[in-house]
Amino acid sequence: MKKTMLLLFVLVATLSASAQYYPDGRPIPPRHRYGNNRGYHRGSSFDQFSDTYFGFRLGMAVATVHSDAANLDGSDSRTGLDVGVVAGKRITNAAPLFFESGLSYTEKGGKGRYEGDKFTYRLQYLELPLLIKYKYPVARDITIEPYAGGYLALGVGGKVKDYGKREAYSSFSNEKGSFRRFDGGLRIGCGASFDRLYVGMSYDVGLANVGHYDFEDTRTGSFNLHIGVTF
């Protein structure tokens, strides 16, 4: 994980160093690098480098739960829904660097076996991302957008299913076989915008111990794919 974060930092630094400049040394804003079209094609009403943007994202999360406690270790992945809205604000005029946040509904969890019996976890969260994004223009209307940051999450629903005991109960309760509601972690990813269309992928690493066992760590993780539109 540390190597991945370092590679992303080097990538962003390299892209920043390759920025174009006016003869007097001032950086050329990305919106001006393609002449009078300001970075978007003739007839388009959307500017990739406006100071603010809003968007809708729809995708899937391939999630796991890794735990030192055998009855919580859902290290086999399960797939869930990931849908939400985002908003971004440019934070400097020296580079196309943005702060992005929003709100999403995400389904995480996992599946595995305990004492020979199958179990599954479905963990439903509301998530608040806190990200720094760099928009690098590669052609008119096309940007590559690496980002990194973190997220905060609140568990709002879900089920634990124990197929051996033929039982199902709430994912978030005070029971030893369930989970704490609050989660949070790191997020790293990269997207691409084609005019208003957005596609992207990200990886979440949970940092909070979401299990009720104080001496055995239980953490979530997920790989996410998204499509969406930006305004």
Residue ranges of model-derived segments:
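Positively charged n-region of N-terminal signal peptides that target proteins for export
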Residues: M1-T4, Q20
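Short glycine/proline- and aromatic-enriched beta-strand/turn motifs that initiate or cap beta-hairpins
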Residues: Q20-D82
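Outer-membrane beta-barrel transmembrane domain signature
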Residues: K89-L97, K118-V210, F231
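Surface-exposed loop and membrane-interface regions of Gram-negative outer-membrane beta-barrel proteins
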Residues: F99-L123
